[in-house]
Amino acid sequence: ADDVSMHTGGSPGSYSQSLTVASADNDGAVGYYFTVGDRNVVYTETSYQNEPLRTLAGEQEYVFIDGFGLEEDWAAIGEALKGKIAICSRGSSSFFEKAEAAVNHGAIATIIYNNQAGVIQVDLSSYTKTNPCVTITKSDGAWVKEHAIPVTDENGKVLYYTGTMALSSEFGTSLYHSEYYSVSSFSSWGTAGALELKPDIIAPGGSIYSVDGTIEGG
C-alpha cells in the first residue's frame, strides 16, 4: 500500500519521549517603518537600484487604490499621483511593473500591499527607476486605507484614497496584538507515525529580530 503519512516531523523529535517545540511567528516586527494614525507600519525592502524609502523621511502624502497598480489604474486618476507615494495591491502584474507605472505617472515611491496573509519578498532586478519600492502586509494595507480619505467622482464612486504618513529614518517596532499566534511556515507538524500529536508545545521562533552572529560585535 502507498505510504499515506503526512507528518513533517523528523528524528528525534517524533520520538514518544522527546519534547518537541513548534515555531510560531513573532507577533510584531522590527525594521524601518512609517506611521499612519497611531500605528508604526514596518515594511519589507529589497535593494537593487531603488533608493531606500527612508531617503524620503518626513511627512509625505500618499494615494491608495484598491487596484493592482496597472498602467490604466494610475492613468485613471490623472494628476492626483504627482509628488505622492503610490500604494496598490499585489497581483495581476509584476512588482517592478507596478512601481514603474506609478513613477511614470508622477509617484515619488511605491508601496505594494499583500493580497494574502504574510510578508512579500520582491524581485526588482528588472526595475529601471531609482524611486523607492517596498511592500507591506495585507493587514497593514487595510489599516492605511482605513485612515485615508476617499476621493469620489460626481456619481459618488470612489476613485482612490488619500492621506499622509510620517516616514522614519530609524529602526522601530510594530506590535500586532493579534488574538492568537500563527504557526511558522517552516515548522514541523504531525501527527507522527505512532499517531501521537507532535510537536508538544509551541513558542515564538519565526520573524525574530536578533543579533547577527557572523558580524563581530553583533
Listing of model-derived features with the role each one plays in the protein:
Residues 1-199, 203, 211-213:
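Structured lumen-facing ectodomains of secretory-pathway proteins
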Residues 214-218:
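Short pre-catalytic strand/loop immediately N-terminal to key active-site residues, enriched for Gly-Thr
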